[in-house]
From Swiss-Prot:
Name the UniProt record assigns to this protein: Putative uncharacterized protein DDB_G0277057
Superkingdom classification of source: Eukaryota
Organism encoding this protein: Dictyostelium discoideum (Social amoeba)
Region (Disordered): 22-79
Comp. bias intervals (Low complexity): 22-72
Length: 79
């Protein structure tokens, strides 16, 4: 490349700008990936909580049904 110091300066500034843009893009990509990971983790936690709640409800229903069956048998024998 020919030219005075000003041309080299402009060329170097262009390289710095390209590097800064690449760094910004990488940072944005990393932030997006982190956000996606956080969202996935939150969704997984919510799903796990829902599953646990459903299991607890099913267990409670089963216990109630068993208790009702036992009570009905008792009353049947004493009725």
């Amino acid at each position: 490349m020919c030219g005075g110091p000003n041309k080299w300066y402009i060329f170097l500034i262009g390289l710095v700008n390209i590097n800064n843009n690449n760094n910004n893009n990488n940072n944005n990509n990393n932030n997006n990936n982190n956000n996606n990971n956080n969202n996935n983790n939150n969704n997984n936690n919510n799903n796990n909580n829902n599953n646990n709640n459903n299991n607890n409800n099913n267990n409670n229903n089963n216990n109630n049904n068993n208790n009702n069956n036992n009570n009905n048998k008792r009353f049947f024998f004493f009725g």
